[in-house]
Amino acid sequence: MSTVLTALHEALDSAPEQDMTTRLDQSWLLGFDTETTGTSPNRDNIVSASLVLRNPRTGYEGDAVAEWIINPGRHISEGASRVNGFTDEYLAENGSEPAESIEQIAGLIMTAQSKHIPLLAYNAPFDVRMLNGDIRQWCSGGMEPMPEKELLVVDPLVIDRAISHRSGRRTLTYTTEYYGVVPHGDFHDATTDTVASVDLIEPMTTLYPQVGSITLGELMDWQRDAHRTWLKQFNEWLTSKGSRPAIDTWF
């Protein structure tokens, strides 16, 4: 086991088991992001992933971080390669064996879940479903996919749509700029994206105290309601343009 992976294990083991009355602005968080061969769970694969454990008392300086480079043994699409910079040749030379890496990532996430430490990801369904697709492909003998409907998740994209009524795009790049979050590196690097996503919670909960006061026990219902409200408005707009309504894909 690598030194950084050991450090994350130790930090997670020493983290407290949180009560469900813990407020979001006082909660430990486990940030998660992936880079992939494409955008289709069950067809594409993860090539890079990062987990970042954030202690609310120490912030960025106290983060425990682990990153994986994974060789799925398949072609990465040109579009994905342009976005994340990975090539087939680089992954073949530097990537780890998929099953072990995917088991490590999922195991750490479920350890955090057992302590009521939310999994934080920007547009969380994508990363969770990519991971579950890889669990099904690589770990069918020893690990079940994560129970998506039972996960405790923080999705800054869902929160932002509920509290900020600005116009324009809501990619991670634009959203961090809006909230004054400066990335620690280049976007579309899994660790940079993970840290930036976690960093969003402080300005969001400071600017909107009603978000900071959401308890872990209230968190999923609040986000589901917020997503349904946004989706209804978005589909009304799509319909007015003659487009087909979007399907609900949140947890």
Question: Where do the PLM segments sit?
Answer:
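A generic alpha-helix surface/boundary motif
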Residues: 74-75, 85, 129, 170
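Short, structured active-site "lid" loops
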Residues: 83-94
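Short, surface-exposed acidic-centric catalytic microdomains
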Residues: 64-84
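DEDD superfamily 3′-5′ metal-dependent exonuclease/proofreading module
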Residues: 1-47, 54-64, 92-251
